[in-house]
Amino acid sequence: MRRIGIDVGGTNTDAVLIEEGKVVRAVKAPTSEDVTSGILDSLQRLGATGVLASGRIDGVMIGTTHFINAVVQRRHLTKVAALRLGMPASASLPPFCDWPEDLAELVRGGVWMVEGGHEYDGRPFMPLDEAAVIKAAHEMKAAGLRSVGISSIFSPLDPSHEKRAAELVGEVMPGASITCSSELGRIGLLERENAGLLNAALADLARDTIAAFERAIRNSGIAAPLFITQNDGTVAEAGQARRLPVYSFASGATNSMRGAAYLSGLADAMVIDVGGTTTDVGQLRNGFPREANSVVKVGGVRTLFRMPDLLSIGLGGGSHVVLEPLKVGPLSVGYRLLKEGIAFGGSQLTTTDVAVASGVLDLGDKRKVGHLDSATCRKVFAKAASMAEEAIDRMKTEAGDVPLIAVGGGAFLIPEQLPGVSRVIHVEHGDCANAVGAAIAQVSGECDQIFKDMTRRDAIDAARTIANDRAVAAGADRRTLATIDSEDMPLAYLPGNSVRVRVRVVGDVAAG
């Protein structure tokens, strides 16, 4: 298969062509403020090398910062109607109750709370008040709202009330964008509801962004399906990503970790991804990033997404360097490195300037950094290594030395030996590991649900079937699906041999 992987970073937009498992060509383009033109630029640079003319492209995989930027920067968000099924319970904590006020003001289009929902064991808490749902939908329509987030108590156990409410709202508001929380989160009403509301707020941006990506691909003369990378290191076809954009919040660092695993051939290792501004440290398990088990805040909003467990520090190739007293980062010149770095005619001393002065990098004009002696350079590199060492130690989950894969454009800051590390692996094409990770990504499906009145084996099989179906819906080839994570927990306080099962599967992208 021939695939193009693109990853948008804070400094560069990287693009690679992978054919039959090998990196054929890699290019970098400056990240543009609107992101999309940077992607088009990277595709054009890749095409200019001539490698795209020799055969069909099977897919273009893009990792984008559009959606997380919209939430963090409070821009391009749509007003959302929040419909919660749970009355008379849950009234004391209405939708948006734990949001930052500035973000809530932007997104909150109205709140409607009606009877419905289920108990913790799946029994109906209250019958769904369909008349109240229809009345709410008419009020939403009259208010000019076109995006709706629906949540229901314990909907991951039984999503039937959410689905029925979505049908009723769709009949009153044809063409509206409707998000059901049961599609997004796990057990935990507020966090799951928040995920649904954020997703609904991104509906218009997701539609416009993915349409722009598809235009960029067409304008580059490439006839290939578009896939968007997700938080867990997998991809979803464009239609699925358009419907569930929140799954693509934190794909950049995840892509780098997947790319590191692919380029090194290691499935279990620590990974340090040194970019232009920040360094991300995480751990690979079975070739995928270890997931965070805690609540994840996105733009100040509590959610329960599938997110990688990462530690970020202010160290990168564009980090500011202060010599007296010695300080590296957290400020960075970012994508302005080629203008502001001393080696390129600017006035700001950066880690890249130090690397040029010491001969580690052959960039810019070495004469401009001739005032940096070898002792000074060694001190700066030692400081950077100390920062990396501390971050790695904080992310390790077991005693002893572990292998470390160093990737990213700033990987020159990581020395060949570090305390607590058995070996440091610098891989070919490591500076574009993020784009490689996007290009080789598979498709995933997950189920996290409580089952009752069945054996443990039947519950696990049922969860696996649901996860498989979700993966296929996201664009996976059913024949290639494999389970990469499975856990079950008997719930003694619930009737009917209740067991909570979480299963995650991955598979290759379906051909065609």
Regions found by a protein language model. Give the residues of each.
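N-terminally biased helix-coil "hinge/interface" segments that flank
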Residues: M1-G512
